[in-house]
Regions:
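Long, charged, low-complexity intrinsically disordered regions
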Residues: 1-38, 43-95
Length: 95
């Protein structure tokens, strides 16, 4: 029914904002090099304020370091974490 398989998942729970940025970039680079096209990034929903990573990750994915690997991203469906996760579509690997 139009569902796309998730090739890889990355959970940012337990990361600080600083460590999450570096770890996410490494994950995205590795996933793309491995030929993954559709990945799931779990940010968590955060507390009452909505969570730092939940708001930071979409901004990061638009930075040049990430954008060179990322085609698009959007909020995950309920079965994959809903507002606490993102589907990310990666560019095809080079070569």
């Amino acid at each position: 029914r139009g569902r796309i398989a998730i090739d890889a998942r990355f959970d940012l729970h337990g990361h600080t904002q600083h460590s999450a940025h570096a770890a996410l970039l490494r994950f995205i680079e590795r996933a793309r090099a491995d030929g993954c096209r559709h990945v799931l990034i779990v940010t968590g929903r955060g507390g009452e304020r909505g969570g730092v990573l939940k708001h930071s990750v979409p901004r990061w994915l638009q930075e040049p370091a990430f954008h060179r690997h990322v085609i698009a991203f959007h909020e995950a469906g309920p079965r994959h974490g809903g507002t606490g996760a993102l589907y990310v579509v990666l560019r095809r690997p080079r070569g």
